[in-house]
Swiss-Prot record:
Gene it is expressed from: hisE
The protein's enzyme class: hydrolase
Highest taxon of the lineage: Bacteria
Cellular location(s): Cytoplasm
An annotated GO cellular component: cytoplasm
Protein name as catalogued: Phosphoribosyl-ATP pyrophosphatase
One GO BP annotation of this record: L-histidine biosynthetic process
Keywords in alphabetical order: Amino-acid biosynthesis, ATP-binding, Cytoplasm, Histidine biosynthesis, Hydrolase, Nucleotide-binding
Length: 104
């Protein structure tokens, strides 16, 4: 089992975001702005969905990694730490999914 966490990935994204856009894909996305990063996130989400529909386990793992990475880039640009998202997930799991949905 891997000990690598989303917080670890978030730290890598933060470091790479400070690099030259000529040398780092992360920096290039951050420099291009939220529209470009969000578009890329959407593309990766579609690719993950396609892999899931095809029951392509290996590709679903690969595309899920891309999806998580691009989500963290979008969160970085929006200045939202992954911890904030995890807190929201924790809040939601304190009640049943149906109760949470009804409370919206």
């Amino acid at each position: 089992m891997s000990t690598f966490t989303l917080s670890d990935l978030e730290a890598i994204v933060a470091i790479r975001a400070k690099a030259s856009p000529d040398e780092s894909w992360t920096a290039k996305l951050v420099t291009a702005g939220q529209d470009k990063a969000a578009k890329k996130l959407g593309e990766e989400a579609i690719e993950a969905v396609m892999a899931a529909v095809k029951n392509d386990r290996a590709n679903l793992i690969y595309e899920s990694a891309d999806l998580l990475y691009h989500l963290l880039v979008v969160l970085k640009i929006a200045d939202i730490p992954i911890e904030t998202v995890m807190e929201e997930l924790q809040r939601r799991t304190a009640q049943s999914g149906l109760s949470e949905k009804a409370s919206r």
